[in-house]
């Protein structure tokens, strides 16, 4: 009877009840308040708690308020303290430790650029990007790289102007990545990768613009995703032929491939023209082709903490971990759903996978593998999750693009998406640059949402 009585008390907290909380933060010193516990109403949510912290910081003076988020045991508080206590089965005798941190405000629309066709892939580069730092070059501003269903790779400046177009693929381009401020790699439905030489304003003025320096061949189906490691000069590719390809950013590191001249009256004029242009371009074979998946590979990424390790996602429902030294699969995890994208959150030791089941799974690759080994599941999209991008300066945050026409902003410490950015039509690609979140898709537009300061 005593247990039942206590349980009844816990689940009938009133709006006038109070609970002791202890505020603490890892923010800079001038945002720290006393860690002595104080009583607050259990009805408070993050906005009310933020008002209290601002009042304590300003010592009663009227100053511009700083919005804060609050974490309890590492999880973002998205309910009232009353709901938290009830869910955890705790009484108001509990002292709640509340960590506060600057809130991430909703991104605001910055710009939209029009493209000629559907945009399949987006990548960005900026002065502090790893590709720039590894190249010892200088870059004045962020640049946008896009791959399109019309077979053209384009670079844009932040004013929306097309700086260069790269024509060579004989079908839709499915993935693009910066290698350096003057070099890019693309892949597409024509089964090939292309290394390009580009020239950006203020960078290597002698560079020849728009030149394919090498065609990389080895896949037997469309190549749908790429990842680049700037320090090891490695490229990895995901193919619909169920194979993961390994390449070099330097053509001289790969073996030459001899290709006979194309023949046949059924070849279109466009293909004949492109084939003639390509006849003088060197072709290279992969460093390795890694078999193991039973269905198309849809996403690949390097392990930021160990560049000899990569991860791949596939429609065969699995995430595989590969050792590049031996070119062997060292771990396989089954998810029960077709996987369409993959992203590593290195400082959290997590790998995120987007699925055809509309959710995002978070996996810890250090944990022993077993069926449905999932650390967390993020639910919110209503269609395929096909692309993801990590926040450049916040370890816990990333963005996801979906065929439901939205880009969602996530914090892995919360159960739901932080914000939803709408687009017209399916979204195929997303990148997160310091200037903002850049996405493209079926509406033939590149949209930029700026992060609020």
UniProtKB/Swiss-Prot annotation:
Kindly give the Gene3D superfamilies that the UniProt entry links to this protein. Answer: YVTN repeat-like/Quinoprotein amine dehydrogenase
Protease listed as a keyword: no
Alphabetically list the UniProt keywords.
Answer: Nucleus, Repeat, Ribosome biogenesis, rRNA processing, WD repeat
Any GO molecular function:
ribonucleoprotein complex binding
Where are the WD-type repeats located?
128-166, 168-206, 218-257, 292-332, 334-373, 380-420, 422-453
User: What's the family?
Assistant: Belongs to the WD repeat WDR12/YTM1 family.
What this protein is called in its record is Ribosome biogenesis protein YTM1
Q: Which GO terms describe its biological process?
A: chromosome organization; maturation of 5.8S rRNA from tricistronic rRNA transcript (SSU-rRNA, 5.8S rRNA, LSU-rRNA); maturation of LSU-rRNA from tricistronic rRNA transcript (SSU-rRNA, 5.8S rRNA, LSU-rRNA); protein-RNA complex remodeling
Places the protein is found: Nucleus, Nucleolus; Nucleus, Nucleoplasm
The protein's matches in Pfam families, at most eight in alphabetical order, are given as: NLE, WD40
- A cellular-component GO term for this protein: preribosome, large subunit precursor
- Region span, Ubiquitin-like (UBL) domain: 19-102
- Which cysteines are disulphide-bonded? none
Q: Output the PANTHER family linked to this UniProt entry.
A: RIBOSOME BIOGENESIS PROTEIN WDR12, WD40 REPEAT PROTEIN 12, 37
């Amino acid at each position: 009877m005593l247990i039942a009585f206590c349980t009844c008390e816990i689940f009938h907290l009133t709006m006038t009840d109070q609970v002791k909380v202890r505020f603490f933060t890892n923010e800079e010193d001038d945002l720290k308040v006393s860690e002595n516990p104080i009583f607050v109403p259990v009805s408070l949510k993050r906005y009310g708690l933020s008002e209290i912290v601002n009042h304590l910081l300003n010592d009663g003076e009227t100053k511009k308020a700083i919005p804060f988020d609050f974490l309890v045991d590492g999880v973002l508080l998205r309910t009232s303290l009353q709901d938290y206590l009830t869910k955890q089965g705790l009484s108001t005798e509990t002292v709640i430790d509340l960590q506060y941190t600057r809130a991430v405000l909703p991104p605001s629309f910055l710009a939209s650029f029009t493209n000629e066709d559907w945009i399949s892939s987006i990548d960005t580069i900026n002065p502090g990007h790893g590709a720039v730092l590894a190249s010892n070059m200088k870059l004045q501003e962020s640049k946008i790289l896009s791959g399109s269903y019309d077979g053209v790779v384009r670079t844009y400046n932040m004013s929306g102007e097309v700086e260069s177009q790269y024509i060579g693929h004989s079908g839709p381009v499915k993935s693009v990545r910066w290698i350096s401020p003057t070099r890019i790699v693309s892949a597409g439905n024509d089964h090939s990768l292309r290394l390009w030489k580009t020239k950006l304003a203020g960078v290597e003025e002698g560079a020849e613009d728009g030149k394919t320096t090498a065609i990389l061949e080895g896949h037997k189906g469309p190549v749908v995703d790429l990842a680049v490691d700037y320090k090891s000069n490695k490229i990895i590719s995901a193919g619909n032929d169920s194979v993961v390809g390994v390449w070099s950013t330097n053509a001289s590191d790969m073996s030459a491939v001899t290709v006979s001249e194309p023949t046949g009256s059924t070849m279109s004029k466009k293909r004949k023209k492109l084939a003639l242009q390509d006849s003088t371009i060197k072709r290279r074979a992969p460093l390795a082709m890694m078999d193991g998946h039973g269905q198309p590979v849809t996403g690949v990424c390097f392990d930021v903490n160990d560049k000899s390790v990569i991860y791949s996602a596939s429609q065969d429902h699995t995430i595989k971990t590969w050792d590049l030294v031996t070119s062997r699969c060292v771990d396989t995890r089954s998810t029960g759903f077709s996987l369409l994208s993959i992203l590593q959150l290195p400082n959290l030791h997590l790998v995120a996978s987007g699925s055809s089941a509309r959710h995002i799974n978070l996996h810890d690759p250090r944990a022993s593998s077993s069926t449905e080994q999932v650390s967390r599941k993020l639910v919110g999209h209503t269609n395929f999750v096909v692309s993801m991008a990590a926040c450049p300066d916040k370890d816990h945050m990333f963005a996801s693009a979906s065929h439901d026409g939205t880009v969602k902003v996530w914090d892995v410490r919360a159960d739901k998406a932080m914000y939803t950015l709408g687009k017209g039509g399916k979204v195929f690609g997303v990148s997160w640059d310091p200037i903002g979140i850049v996405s493209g898709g079926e509406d033939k537009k590149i949209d930029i949402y700026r992060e609020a300061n």
